[in-house]
Amino acid sequence: LLESVYAYAFQKKVRINKLKEMLWRDELATHQKLLFHGAKSEIHGAIDLTRGRKNNDFGQGFYTGESYEQALSFVSGFDQSSIYFLNFDDSDLKCRKYAVNQEWMMTIAYYRGSLDAYKDHPTVQKLIAQSRACDYIIAPIADNRMFQIINAFINGELTDEQCKHCLAATNLGMQYILTSEQAVAKTRL
């Protein structure tokens, strides 16, 4: 029966995942957010903050996004990939929110390895401390193309204003990064 339902939906171009997203959004309470995680393989057990790469935008953490399509774009080329819907309750959690600005650019540059020569500089140390003094982060997504622009800024090829204008034009959406066990405990897969 389920196979025939899916076959009918496919034939009629019904976007089942979009319907599922709408139903999940209807069930959200205050302080709850619907987030999406694209995984290259199935998640077994609880969310593990140590599984992610250390050279992601904000270091190790559990990376999620605001849209199904966004999560899909990160894992669509992998055979065993999955998209997870998450119910995230942000009440009583400390958030660090970033905008497209110099602080955001330099924090990403640090975690992606472009500021290794300056890792002991007080400004970089302050950025690192601020990025870890929270339970979760909300920040603009920086894909590899955006990172090339950030690197051009770090290398002195662009001013910070030129860099911000280039990056603001890409607008890939916002990412939510869970960075503490408290945030994980308030997230339901």
Describe every region a protein language model picked out.
Residues 60-63, 137-139:
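Short cationic amphipathic helices and targeting signals
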Residues 2-57:
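ADP-ribose/NAD+-binding catalytic cleft of ART/PARP-like enzymes
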